[in-house]
C-alpha cells in the first residue's frame, strides 16, 4: 500500500493510522449529512409523484366517464390522453425516486454501517490487543535471572501470542482504513454519476413522451381556438336572434291587442274573421306548430290548484300539453309565479346526438292530448269573477285555462276554434286516431316537437321500425320460414349471410364462428337493426341467399332425369329433424360449400373485375353472389391493381418496391389536377370505392364480410383517409365505430386527424371525439 511506506510498528506508522482515522471520522459526519439530504430529496420526489398522480386523478374525475354527457361536452376523451401522459410522468418520477434509493441511499447506508463501522470496531480490537501485548511484554521483561525455566517459557509463549494478536489487529485496522480510502475515490463518484444518469433518463423519457404528444397538443390548441371563435360567432348569432325574437314578440303583442280590440268591437265574436285554408291540404301537409305557449290550467281536484303548462296546437288539429315536474303548484291563481323549470341544458344538442342525456330535452317530457274533434270552446270560466279565462269542453273533461293577458286569450280561442272547424270539415274523422292519446294516456315526446312536428313523426317511425323488425324481415320472400329447416316464424338472423333462422339452427350458426355467421335476435338485439341492416336484408332474403348456398339442391329440383343427384348427396333437413342432422347439413352448406355451384369466370373477365364492376354499379346481389360462389377468400379485399395494369397511374420499379418508398398523396399529379382523392385509384380496395360511392348498404355488406378497414392504397391512405378527404363524415364515423384506426399515417406522414384539421375546423363534434378517442 503506497500510503504505508514502512509497515513496522513505529511512531510514523501510528501517526498515519491516526490521520486516516481522523479522515474516516470526518467522512462519516459528511456521509450522515448527505444521507439526511438524500432522504429529504427522496421524500420530495415521492411527494411530486403522488401530487402528479393526484392531479391526474382529479382531471379524470373532472373529465368523467365515457358515457357522461358533460365529459363529452368538455372534451373528456381528449383530456384522457393527457391524463395518461401525466400518469406516465408520475411513474417516471417514481422510478427516479427508486433509482436514488437504490443507487445512492442504500450504498451510502452500507458505507456508513459496514465500512466506517468496521474501521471503528477494528480500532477497538487493536487497542485491546495492544494493551494485552504491553502487559505480556512487561511480565516477560520483569523476570529475574533465577526464574524457573518453565515459567520463562510460559511467559515467552504468552508474549508471542499477544504479539501475534497485536500484529493481526494492527493490520486489520490498516485494511479497514485503506478500504475506506480506496472506496472514497470511486464510491461517491459512481453513485452521484448514476444519479445524474437516472435524471438524464428521467428527462429523456419525459421529453420523448411529450414530444410524441406535441402534434396532438398543437392540434387540440388549434381546435380549441377554432371552437372559441366559432362560439363567439354563435353567441353573436344568438344575440341577434334574441333581439329579433323580442322585436317580433312586441309586434305580435301589439297585433294581438289590436285583434282583441277588434273582436271586442264586434261583440266578442269568436273566430269571426279567421281565413280558412283548404282543409284537406292543411291536414295532409307536414305538421307544423300553429301556436304554443304557457297557460294556467285549473286542476279538477278538490284543491282546484292552478298549474302552469306548456300547450301546443299544430296544423293537424292536435292540441297537447306537457307534464313538466319543474312547475310549482299554486294554491290560487293569484299567486302566479313566472319562474318555471324549462331549462334545456347548455349541451342539449350535443347530448341528443349521442343519446346520453336524462334531462327534459331528451324525450322524457310526458304530454297529454286534448281531443278537439268533439270539443267546443267558451270564453270565461265557470266562476265569472276570474279574468282572462276560457274553457275547452269535451264529453270526457272540461279544461279551464287562463292566459296572461286578454290578447293572448283571444288568440288562443280563435286558433283553437279554427282547428275545431278544420277537423269537422275534413275526412280526417274517418281515420283511426292512432297518433292521439286520451286524457289518461301519456307518452314521451322529444322537446323539439314543440318547434316542429317533423321530429315527432321521425321518432314515431323509428319506434315503429324497432317494434316491427320481425314483421318487416319475415315479410321478405322466403323469410317466413327458417333458411335451413323451414321452421315457421324464425326469430333469429345471420347479419352477414342475410338469412333468417329458427332458434335451433341459430345455435349451429353460432358454433360456426363470427367469421362465418354473425347471429343476432330479431327481438332482443334491438340496437343491431339499424335501417341500413334492414335495407341489406331487403336486398337479400332467404330465397335469394339459398339459391346460391343451395344451388345444387335447386339444380336437382329442376332436373327431371336426376342427372344432378351425384352433385348433391345431401337433403335439406325438416323442422322435426334432430340437432345433429341440422348441424351436419349447415356445416356442409357453409364450411364446405358442398351445395354451391362454383362460379366459372368468363375467359375475358376475372372474378375480381366483376366484383369491382358490381361495387361501382351498387349491385348488392351480384357482390353477394361473387363472394359466395368464388373460391377466393380474399375477393372482398380486391384492389384496383388486381384488375388493371399496375403502372396505370404510377410506375413502380424494383428499387422503389425494395425500399418501400413512400408516395405523398399531395404530390400526386392526378389528385392535384382534379382536387379529388378518388382520382388516383392505384392500390384502392373495394372499401375505398364504396366510401366514394356513398351507398351505406354497399358499405355494410363489405364490412359484414370482413373487408379490411385499414387497408392502404398506393399513397398509404386508408378508407378513413378517403372519407375525411372527400368530406364524407357520415361514413368516417361508421368506419371509426367499426374499428378503423385513425392513427395510421399516409405516405405524407399525416394521420386522419391531422388531415381533417388540415382542411379546417372540425365542426362535427362527434367525429372529432371519435378521432381523438381512437387516435
UniProtKB/Swiss-Prot annotation:
Molecular function as annotated in GO: GTPase activator activity; zinc ion binding
PROSITE patterns registered for this protein in UniProt: ANK_REP_REGION, ANK_REPEAT, ARFGAP, PH_DOMAIN
Residue spans of the ANK repeats: 682-711, 715-744
Xref: Gene3D superfamilies: Ankyrin repeat-containing domain, Arf GTPase activating protein, Arfaptin homology (AH) domain/BAR domain, Pleckstrin-homology domain (PH domain)/Phosphotyrosine-binding domain (PTB)
Protein name: ADP-ribosylation factor GTPase-activating protein AGD4
Chain ranges of the PH domain: 288-421
Residue stretches making up the Arf-GAP domain: 467-603
Zn finger limits (C4-type): 482-505
Domain of life of the organism encoding this protein: Eukaryota
Keyword annotations from UniProtKB, A to Z: ANK repeat, Coiled coil, GTPase activation, Metal-binding, Repeat, Zinc, Zinc-finger
Described purpose of this protein according to its UniProt entry: Probable GTPase-activating protein.
Tissues expressing the protein: Expressed in roots, hypocotyls, cotyledons, leaf and shoot apical meristems and siliques.
InterPro entries xrefs: ACAP1/2/3-like, AGD1/2/3/4_BAR_plant, AH/BAR_dom_sf, Ankyrin_rpt, Ankyrin_rpt-contain_sf, ARFGAP/RecO, ArfGAP_dom, ArfGAP_dom_sf
Gene Ontology CC: one annotated term: cytoplasm
Residue ranges constituting the BAR domain according to the UniProt record: 2-226
A matching Pfam family: ArfGap
Amino acid at each position: 500500500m503506497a500510503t504505508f511506506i514502512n509497515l513496522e510498528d513505529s511512531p510514523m506508522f501510528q501517526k498515519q493510522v491516526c490521520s486516516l482515522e481522523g479522515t474516516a471520522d470526518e467522512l462519516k459526519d459528511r456521509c450522515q449529512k448527505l444521507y439526511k439530504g438524500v432522504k429529504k430529496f427522496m421524500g420530495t420526489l415521492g411527494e411530486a409523484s403522488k401530487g402528479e398522480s393526484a392531479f391526474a386523478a382529479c382531471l379524470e374525475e373532472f373529465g368523467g366517464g365515457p358515457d357522461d354527457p358533460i365529459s363529452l361536452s368538455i372534451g373528456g376523451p381528449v383530456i384522457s390522453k393527457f391524463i395518461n401522459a401525466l400518469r406516465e410522468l408520475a411513474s417516471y418520477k417514481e422510478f427516479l425516486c427508486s433509482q436514488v434509493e437504490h443507487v445512492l441511499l442504500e450504498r451510502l447506508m452500507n458505507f456508513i454501517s459496514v465500512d466506517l463501522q468496521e474501521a471503528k470496531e477494528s480500532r477497538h480490537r487493536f487497542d485491546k490487543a495492544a494493551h494485552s501485548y504491553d502487559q505480556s511484554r512487561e511480565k516477560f521483561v520483569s523476570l529475574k535471572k533465577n526464574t524457573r525455566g518453565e515459567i520463562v517459557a510460559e511467559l515467552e509463549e504468552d508474549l508471542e501470542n499477544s504479539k501475534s494478536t497485536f500484529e493481526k489487529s494492527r493490520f486489520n485496522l490498516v485494511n479497514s482504513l485503506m478500504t475506506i480510502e480506496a472506496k472514497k475515490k470511486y464510491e461517491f463518484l459512481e453513485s452521484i454519476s448514476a444519479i445524474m444518469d437516472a435524471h438524464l433518463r428521467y428527462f429523456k423519457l419525459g421529453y420523448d413522451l411529450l414530444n410524441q404528444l406535441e402534434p396532438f397538443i398543437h392540434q387540440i390548441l388549434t381546435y380549441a381556438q377554432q371552437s372559441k371563435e366559432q362560439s363567439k360567432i354563435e353567441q353573436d348569432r344568438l344575440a341577434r336572434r334574441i333581439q329579433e325574437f323580442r322585436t317580433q314578440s312586441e309586434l305580435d303583442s301589439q297585433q294581438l291587442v289590436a285583434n282583441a280590440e277588434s273582436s271586442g268591437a264586434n261583440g266578442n265574436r269568436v273566430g269571426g274573421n279567421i281565413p280558412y285554408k283548404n282543409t284537406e291540404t292543411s291536414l295532409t301537409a307536414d305538421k307544423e306548430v300553429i301556436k304554443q305557449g304557457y297557460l294556467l290550467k285549473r286542476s279538477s281536484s278538490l284543491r282546484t290548484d292552478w298549474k302552469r303548462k306548456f300547450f301546443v296546437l299544430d296544423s293537424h288539429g292536435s292540441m297537447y300539453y306537457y307534464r313538466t315536474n319543474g312547475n310549482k303548484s299554486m294554491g290560487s291563481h293569484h299567486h302566479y309565479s313566472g319562474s318555471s323549470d324549462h331549462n334545456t341544458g347548455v349541451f342539449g344538442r350535443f347530448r341528443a346526438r349521442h343519446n346520453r342525456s336524462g334531462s327534459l330535452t331528451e324525450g322524457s317530457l310526458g304530454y297529454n292530448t286534448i281531443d278537439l274533434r268533439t270539443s267546443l270552446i267558451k270564453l270565461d270560466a265557470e266562476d265569472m269573477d276570474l279574468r282572462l279565462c276560457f274553457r275547452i269542453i269535451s264529453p270526457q273533461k272540461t279544461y279551464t285555462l287562463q292566459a296572461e293577458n286578454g290578447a293572448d286569450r283571444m288568440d288562443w280561442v280563435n286558433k283553437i276554434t279554427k282547428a275545431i272547424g278544420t277537423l269537422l270539415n275534413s275526412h280526417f274523422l274517418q281515420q283511426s286516431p292512432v297518433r292521439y292519446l286520451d286524457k289518461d294516456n301519456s307518452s314521451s315526446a322529444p322537446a323539439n316537437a314543440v318547434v316542429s312536428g317533423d321530429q315527432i313523426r321521425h321518432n314515431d317511425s323509428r319506434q315503429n321500425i324497432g317494434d316491427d323488425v320481425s314483421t318487416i324481415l319475415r315479410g321478405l320472400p322466403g323469410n317466413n320460414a327458417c333458411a335451413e329447416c323451414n321452421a315457421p316464424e324464425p326469430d333469429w338472423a345471420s347479419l352477414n349471410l342475410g338469412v333468417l333462422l329458427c332458434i335451433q339452427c341459430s345455435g349451429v350458426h353460432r358454433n360456426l364462428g363470427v367469421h362465418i355467421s354473425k347471429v343476432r335476435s330479431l327481438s332482443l338485439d334491438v340496437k343491431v337493426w339499424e335501417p341500413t341492416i334492414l335495407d341489406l336484408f331487403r336486398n337479400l332474403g332467404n330465397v335469394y341467399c339459398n339459391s346460391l348456398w343451395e344451388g345444387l339442391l335447386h339444380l336437382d329440383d329442376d332436373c327431371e332425369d336426376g342427372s344432378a343427384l351425384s352433385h348433391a348427396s345431401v337433403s335439406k333437413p325438416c323442422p322435426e329433424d334432430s340437432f345433429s342432422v341440422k348441424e351436419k347439413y349447415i356445416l356442409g352448406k357453409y364450411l364446405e360449400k358442398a351445395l354451391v355451384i362454383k362460379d366459372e369466370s368468363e375467359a375475358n373477365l376475372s372474378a375480381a373485375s366483376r366484383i369491382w364492376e358490381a361495387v361501382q354499379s351498387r349491385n348488392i346481389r351480384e357482390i353477394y353472389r361473387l363472394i359466395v360462389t368464388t373460391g377466393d377468400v380474399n375477393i372482398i379485399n380486391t384492389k384496383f391493381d388486381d384488375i388493371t395494369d399496375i403502372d396505370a397511374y404510377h410506375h413502380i420499379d424494383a428499387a422503389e418496391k425494395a425500399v418501400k418508398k413512400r408516395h405523398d398523396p399531395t404530390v400526386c399529379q392526378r389528385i392535384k389536377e382534379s382536387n379529388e382523392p378518388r382520382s388516383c385509384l392505384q392500390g384502392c380496395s373495394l372499401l375505398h370505392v364504396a366510401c366514394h360511392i356513398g351507398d351505406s348498404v354497399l358499405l355494410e355488406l363489405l364490412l359484414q364480410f370482413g373487408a379490411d378497414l385499414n387497408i392502404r392504397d398506393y399513397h398509404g391512405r386508408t378508407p378513413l383517409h378517403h372519407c375525411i378527404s372527400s368530406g364524407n363524415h357520415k361514413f368516417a364515423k361508421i368506419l371509426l365505430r367499426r374499428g378503423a384506426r385513425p392513427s395510421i399515417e399516409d405516405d405524407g406522414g399525416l394521420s386522419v386527424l391531422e388531415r381533417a384539421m388540415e382542411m379546417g375546423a372540425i365542426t362535427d363534434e362527434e367525429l372529432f371525439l371519435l378521432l381523438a378517442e381512437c387516435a
